[in-house]
Amino acid sequence: MKENEKVIMEKGIHTDFKENMTYGEYLQLDSLLSSQQRLSDHHDEMLFIVIHQASELWMKLILHELNAAIESIKQDKLPPAFKMLARVSKIQSQIIQSWDILATLTPSEYIEFRDSLGQASGFQSYQYRMIEYALGYKTPHALKIYEKDPELHARLHKALHTPSLYDVAIQALVKEGFPIHKDVLNRDITQPYEEDATVEAAWIEVYADVQKYWDLYQLAEKLIDIEDWLQQWRFRHMKTVERIIGHKMGTGGSSGVSYLKRVLDQCFFPELWNVRTKL
């Protein structure tokens, strides 16, 4: 046996899988790798599909971690939530890098298969919508997009009516004794969050006495990390779209780059950003 074969077939490596589960079976690779179905004959459509499918897989993990973190905070278990939220930030940094790959798609290449998408658009990503809901940016009107699939619509409806990460963070402030206005605590959580002076005052106190409120301080910084990464993702999204299609209308009917620029102004945790100025 050649030396390189000895390395590859090291004694103890399993080779008989007649009655054992394989790597491919565990990951269901046959199903996963057969889901890249091009609707055109253009070579670069495969890139477009893989980038978006990979992003959806990462978003699935983000939701998994965000939902677990929300439950952990609700149960007053903040330190475990920190690990989950830190992982979310790492995933976000990974997704941002995917724009570098998609940016290798030129306008001349994309135009060859863009019509194959019809009205399909990333705007319709239900997982991205659920991430926004989990972070507190609630948009009830967006549910109409998902009426075609009753089961999916029900999931999004549930997410819309579920307390967000920022909702439970504010509850953590209340449990620590901070006087949060009743209008904040009794607000309609299906609507976008609006900043409040009592919430801002609480966070200012947290940042002014880090040692006393260490866990709340750590929570606040984890939230800032997530929004920071999300805004970087949004910016790269906008610039990549501009690079590929310029200022054309999006396939989903939006104004394209103009819409994506407006989205950059959406803020999830306004008081945590205000604190930077007020300290």
From Swiss-Prot:
Superkingdom of source: Bacteria
Cofactor needs: heme
GO biological process: L-tryptophan catabolic process to acetyl-CoA; L-tryptophan catabolic process to kynurenine
Alphabetically ordered keywords of this record: Dioxygenase, Heme, Iron, Metal-binding, Oxidoreductase, Tryptophan catabolism
Keyword Oxidoreductase recorded: yes
GO molecular function: heme binding; metal ion binding; tryptophan 2,3-dioxygenase activity
Pfam families for the chain: Trp_dioxygenase
EC number(s) on file: 1.13.11.11
Free-text comment on the cofactor: Binds 1 heme group per subunit.
Gene3D superfamilies assigned: 1.20.58.480
Enzyme class, broadest EC rank: oxidoreductase
Disulfide bonds: none
InterPro entries: Trp/Indoleamine_2_3_dOase-like, Trp_2-3-dOase_bac, Trp_2_3_dOase
Positions of substrate binding: F48, I49, V50, I51, H52, Y110, R114, T251
Pathway: Amino-acid degradation; L-tryptophan degradation via kynurenine pathway; L-kynurenine from L-tryptophan: step 1/2
Role noted for this protein: Heme-dependent dioxygenase that catalyzes the oxidative cleavage of the L-tryptophan (L-Trp) pyrrole ring and converts L-tryptophan to N-formyl-L-kynurenine. Catalyzes the oxidative cleavage of the indole moiety.
Protein family membership: Belongs to the tryptophan 2,3-dioxygenase family.
Binding partners and assembly: Homotetramer.
Name used for this protein in its record: Tryptophan 2,3-dioxygenase
Native species: Bacillus mycoides (strain KBAB4)
Gene behind the chain: kynA
